[in-house]
Amino acid sequence: MALERTLSIIKPDAVAKNVIGEIYTRFERAGFKIVEAKMIQLDDELAGGFYAEHKERPFYKDLVAFMTSGPVVVSVLEGEGAVLRHRELMGATNPKEAAAGTLRADYATSIDANAVHGSDSVESATREIAYFFGK
């Protein structure tokens, strides 16, 4: 496996539940190195730009509203096969379908308030990291 970087966002629902530290502990136990991190409040422009690929989808407005509803923690995780391993740790988008022990099974409440975001490919990770960290 290659050393990769991936973007992780702890979403407003998980931040509001005060589980940032628990999620970071899970990242570290899974062998990820947290190489960049910041807590920010997304506005409509920043959230809308990040999710621009979904602009024509029916859930877009609700997604932007949710992502701007409170602060988020944006992080860059580094590790062997980071993109796929992070997605496995997150679990299925719908927490009702997420495997026991995944972040979404443990911390998410709905398909919308699903606790975390993770890049879906190495290419997406590169683009998403640049979007938030300018690299």
Swiss-Prot record:
Q: Name one GO biological process term.
A: CTP biosynthetic process
Q: Which SMART domains match?
A: NDK
What this protein catalyses is: a 2'-deoxyribonucleoside 5'-diphosphate + ATP = a 2'-deoxyribonucleoside 5'-triphosphate + ADP; a ribonucleoside 5'-diphosphate + ATP = a ribonucleoside 5'-triphosphate + ADP
Record key words, sorted: ATP-binding, Cytoplasm, Kinase, Magnesium, Metal-binding, Nucleotide metabolism, Nucleotide-binding, Phosphoprotein, Transferase
The positions annotated for binding ATP are K11, F59, R87, T93, R104, N114
Gene Ontology molecular function: ATP binding; metal ion binding; nucleoside diphosphate kinase activity
Q: Where found? A: Cytoplasm
Q: Which CDD domains match?
A: NDPk_I (cd04413)
Coarsely, its chief localization is cytoplasm
Instruction: Give a GO cellular-component term.
Output: cytoplasm
Annotated active site residues, numbered on this chain, are H117
Assigned EC number: 2.7.4.6
This protein's assembly is summarised as: Homotetramer.
| Family assignment from sequence similarity | Belongs to the NDK family.
Protein's recorded name: Nucleoside diphosphate kinase
